[in-house]
Structure formats: structure tokens, C-alpha cells
Amino acid sequence: MARFVVAGPSEYLAITGWGIDDVKLAKKAWVFAGQKCSRFDISPVNYEFNVEAMSSEKLAFNLPAVFTIGPKITPAPAPEVDGASNQRRVLMPESEEKLLLYAKLIAPHDHASNHVKQLVKGVIEGETRVLAASMTMEEIFQGTKKFKQEVFDQVQLDLNKFGLYIYNANVKQLVDEPGHEYFSYLGKKTQQEAANKAKVDVAEERMKGEVGAKEREGLTRQNAAKVDAETKVVSVRQQGIGLREEAKVKAEVQVYENEREAEIAAAQAGLAMKKAGWEKQSKVAQVEAVKAVAIREAELQMEVERKNALRLTEKLKAEQLSKATVQYETQVQESNAALYNRQKAADATLYEQVKSAEARKAQADAMFFEQKLAEDARLYAKQKEAEALAMVGKAKVEYVTSMLQALGGDYGALRDYLMIDGGMYQEMARVNASAVSGMQPKISIWSGADGAAGEAGAGAMQQVAGVYKMLPPLLSTVHEQTGMQPPAWMGSLPKDGAN
């Protein structure tokens, strides 16, 4: 059986069933057999919450808030064609879509159900806690307006999924959790700072009155002395400028010639330095890649320890900073007042002395500038000479490195070669000869082939064998007298007791 149903001024009808694909919204409609009609109120509702959140330093606080929330309704404009007012749309398409979401949310529940309130509360508390956990307590307190706006925006994004709109959001002042007195301490600190500032302002105004009269008298004397001193300074300065410009031109010519010679040497040195730098960067990059993981682990551990230290520091600071700040500022203001009186008394005398010194300084600067340019030219030439010596040293390093590689990394063979090439053995022989000159050193004589070297019938092989037999005692004697070891390629000293 059909019946005609009309919704109230702040109500809508949600009709489902026979002949309707999803949900039909209407202010009035015929409801036929096989259809179900539900009324739902679209009036905004106030939701009061007391959100308990925690900052990134684990400081708890309360955030009282009142949100006015309901479905967003935007009536469609009346059509321009006359006589079509009965056929116009009730809602704008976007509002009708959001109202459908709201109808599906609230229709299964009773009008007095707490379902929507619990949903809204869960969204607000969740977004508030997530946002607060990413900020410090100082950031939340200093940027309260920004914090409230971000909470509002994040909550609205989530409520859009249910067709709800925040008509008004009133987030009250942040409140301390029981047992946490962060905001209370901040309030006491502000009150004490205001009282101290008032005391300082009174003292400053009294000081300005007494100092003002003295300043006027001092300025009159200072200005007279200033004019006389500036006249003398200008005269001396003009003479110094002329001498300085002349010396500057001469020095620039000399510097230009030195620079041209230096650029040629620098270009050659730069190429060699770049090659070495590229090789160094390649090796450093490999080492850095290996060490990066260990460094990152250490940094993360340091960050955890730093956060713990900051939390303890903030707690102690809140307890002790207020008293220390008041005492410090009071002592500073008293010291500043006494210091200001002494400084003003000394300024007048100092000003006249400074101006006289500036005149003498300007004349000395001209002479110093001329000497400095000459010294700079000599210094530049010496620097380039040092760079050339450095390049020679680098070439020697590369030569030694290439020789070491050619000898297969045998450091002893390289050392022997360098000593032979540098005439070290000849020099050592000369020094040893001079050291034993006039002495009677131990002299050992060995005969080849057991004293048979003089026989006419001895063969060549016996002579060679005799030479080899003489080498061990010869090397031992050299070691005893000079402490030098034979080269590795020649052989080694005989062990104690060996023949």
C-alpha cells in the first residue's frame, strides 16, 4: 500500500527498496510497497572533547575542543526558465553525494545513537595525537594557531569520507595533565619577566634624565674638537694618497709580469695534481662506502641518546631557569648602569686622542703600503720557487715508485740501487778510510784453494772455488768492523759455529 511521507524542515528522507538502485533522497515522496523510508536529521551537532595528547618529548597535555559538525547542504539555484520551478533540483550534485554518504552512515542507527559522536571523537583524537607526537612542546605552545589549523585541516580530510563538514571548531587553550606543570611554569616565568621589565624601565628612564644633561655638554666639546681634528686629517690624507697611488702603479707592473710566469708553471703543476687527486678520490670513495653503514648506526644511537638528554634538560630547565633568569637580569641591569656612566666620561677624552692618532696613522699607512707592495712581489717570487721545488720532489717520488714496481716491490733491492746510483758506497769507503787513517786495524788474509793458488798446474775452476771459500770470512770481517750486512743477492753471514 502506498503512503505519502513528508520530511521536517531540518530532515531528509532516505528511501530504499523496489525500483531504487541505491538510495533516494527527498524532502517528500510516495513510499510504495517493497520500499523502506527512514528520516534523518541534518542539523549540525556540537561535539565536546577533551583530547589527551603527548608531544615528541613525551610531555602529556590536554586539548579541550568543541566541534560543530554536520552534513554540508548547498541548495541548487532556481532555473531561469519560467514555470519550471517544480522541476528544479533540490541539492547541488556535490552536496547530494555527501548527503548520501551521511545517510548511509546514520540510517542504520537510532537518532539518539552515540555512533556518530564516537566516530568523530576517534578521528579528532587520532589526528591530534599524531600531529602532537611530531612536534615538541615548545613548537606546539609557540605556534598554537598553526597547530589548531593543522588539526582542523586533517580532521576535515577524514570527515569528508563520511559526508560530514566542520561548520565551526573552537580549540581552547592547552592545559597541563595532572602531575605535569609545564604550562604553569611558563606562566610564572612570564609574570616574573613582566615585573622585572617594569623595574628595569623605571631605572632606565631615571638614568636617561641624568645622563641627557651630561651628554649635551659633552657633545658641544666633542664637536669642536672633531672639526679641528678632521681638518688636520684631510690635509695629511691627501699627501698620503698621492704617494700610495704612485707606489701602487709600480707594484702592479711587477706583479703582472710575475703572474704571467706563474700561470705557465701553475698550468703544468695543475695537470699533475688533478691526476693524483682523481686517483685519491676513487680510493676515498671506496673507503667511505664501507664506513657509511657503521657511521649511520653510530649517528642513530647518538640521536636516541640526544633525545633522552634533551628531555631531562627541559625538565630541569623548567624548574630552575625562572629563578636564575630573574637574578641574572637584575645583576646585569645594575652592572650596565654603572658601566654606562664610566663609558660616557671616558668617551670625550678618547675621541680627541683617536682623531690625533688617525692623522699619524694615515701618514704611516702610505709608507707601509709602499713597503708592503715591494714585499708582496718578493714573496710571490719565493712562493713560485717553492712550488717548483715541490714539483721536483713529487717527480722524484713518482720515479722511486716506478722503480719499486719494476723491482717487484723488493725494497732492499731498491735501496741498494739508490745507494749505488747516489755514490753512497764510495762515500762510505772514503769515510771509513779517513776513520781508520793512522790506525792499525785487524787485517785478515785468505788464500785460495787451501794455499794452492800459486801452483802452476792449478786449473781455473780451483781458483773460482777459492774465491767462493773466501767470501764468508770476508763478509764476517766487514760486518765486525762496519756493522753492515751484505746484500740479499750476494749471500748471508755464516751462523755461529758454522765452517
UniProtKB/Swiss-Prot annotation:
<comment type="similarity">
    <text>Belongs to the band 7/mec-2 family. Flotillin subfamily.</text>
</comment>
<dbReference type="GO" id="GO:0044853">
    <property type="term" value="C:plasma membrane raft"/>
</dbReference>
<dbReference type="InterPro" id="IPR027705">
    <property type="entry name" value="Flotillin_fam"/>
</dbReference>
<dbReference type="InterPro" id="IPR001107">
    <property type="entry name" value="Band_7"/>
</dbReference>
<keyword id="KW-0175">Coiled coil</keyword>
<feature type="lipid moiety-binding region" description="S-palmitoyl cysteine">
    <location>
        <position position="37"/>
    </location>
</feature>
<dbReference type="GO" id="GO:0005901">
    <property type="term" value="C:caveola"/>
</dbReference>
<protein>
    <recommendedName>
        <fullName>Flotillin-like protein 2</fullName>
    </recommendedName>
</protein>
<keyword id="KW-1003">Cell membrane</keyword>
<dbReference type="InterPro" id="IPR036013">
    <property type="entry name" value="Band_7/SPFH_dom_sf"/>
</dbReference>
<feature type="coiled-coil region">
    <location>
        <begin position="243"/>
        <end position="319"/>
    </location>
</feature>
<dbReference type="Pfam" id="PF01145">
    <property type="entry name" value="Band_7"/>
</dbReference>
<keyword id="KW-0472">Membrane</keyword>
<comment type="function">
    <text>May act as a scaffolding protein within caveolar membranes, functionally participating in formation of caveolae or caveolae-like vesicles.</text>
</comment>
<dbReference type="GO" id="GO:0005886">
    <property type="term" value="C:plasma membrane"/>
</dbReference>
<keyword id="KW-0449">Lipoprotein</keyword>
<keyword id="KW-0564">Palmitate</keyword>
